[in-house]
Amino acid sequence: LKNVFVDKKIAGRYYQEAAIKAVCDSFDTRNRRKALLVMATGSGKTRTVIALCKVLSEQGWVKNILFLADRNSLVTQAKRSFVNLLPDLSVTNLCEEKDNYAAHCVFSTYQTMINCIDTIQDKEGKLFTCGHFDLVICDEAHRSIYNKYRDIFNYFDAPLIGLTATPKDEIDKNTYEIFELENGVPTYGYELAQAVKDGYLVDFMSVETTLKFIEHGIVYDELSPEDKEAYEDTFEDENGEMPDSIGSAALNEWLFNEDTIKKVLHILMTNGLKIDYGNKIGKTIIFAKNHRHAEKIYEVFGKEYSHLTGYAMVIDNRLKYAQSAIDEFSDSKKL
């Protein structure tokens, strides 16, 4: 794997090529079987690993590839990228195609693959033998994934490449141990600060806010009648008793406070990035605590901004057409 040619149409940035060559050097010169790439979100991890797969395939190192991610949407997106950039590669998404096991590049969630290696066919044995794959790619590699799905990594006898956007200094020490690396020293790293400096990514800006309940907790006697009712519904126990106040640390259970949501939405609609010469809010993602919280935010948005019909939508694993909704949101021509 010395002096390999990297397809610059797939991965043309200097750090992408450097990452590919670092993995090749690790596998070939250093005889390692595990590699960890730490690359900032938006820097092209998937493109990098696609170009790497092309290099390893052309050099005769790999034929069958397994790409694992923890969510269906990530599996779908990765498969789509492989198809677009390596159109001659036969691929399958096990989450959608349950009977196409002959493809050279298999995409799957961890749970689906666990089911596959636990399944035995009557005539031909297991769906995938332990030596079926020549390379396993683990998206968002971290200790919790490895611990939860250890059987996958123990079962397949193949080199392992981990991808993560977590800054290298924040990655759990045990994750480095999994990839047999020195703590804080990935196979290759390209982080946000460098990407911003290079002009490939834009740094984030934060808007600091002070919300009474979140910062200082809740005192029942200071609430409005409407919020008192919600407080009672939320915190009253089976004996009809409830605390006089709730500290800010306990408020994760009461993020559904309508007043808090209204204030957060007001801050967003006032200070959020605008389009159409500042006349309307641009595309925005609001991360909720859970599905119920997301539904509450959606409900409050509908009340407060009833003139913006169709502006807000809850997208999570309960939505049957979640991927289509994500695709539409990602389309710059659609709002």
Predicted stretch roles:
Residues K173-I281:
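Interdomain helical connector at the RecA1-RecA2 junction of SF1/SF2 helicase-like NTPases
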Residues N317-L335:
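Conserved helicase ATPase core of P-loop NTP-dependent helicases/translocases
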Residues L1-N64, A69, S73, Q77-D88, ...:
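ATP-dependent helicase/translocase motor core
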Residues T29-R33, N100-A102, T119-D134, R150, ...:
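Short basic/glycine-enriched coil/helix segment immediately N-terminal to the Walker B
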Residues N72-L74, Q111-N115, H142-R143, A158, ...:
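Conserved nucleotide-binding/hydrolysis micro-motifs of P-loop NTPases
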Residues E124-G162, P167:
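SF2 helicase catalytic motif II
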Residues N290-V314:
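Conserved helicase motor "Helicase C" RecA-like lobe of SF1/SF2 P-loop NTPases
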Residues A11-A19, K45-T48, E253-L265, H293:
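Phosphate/oxyanion-binding active-site loops and adjacent basic polyanion-contact surfaces
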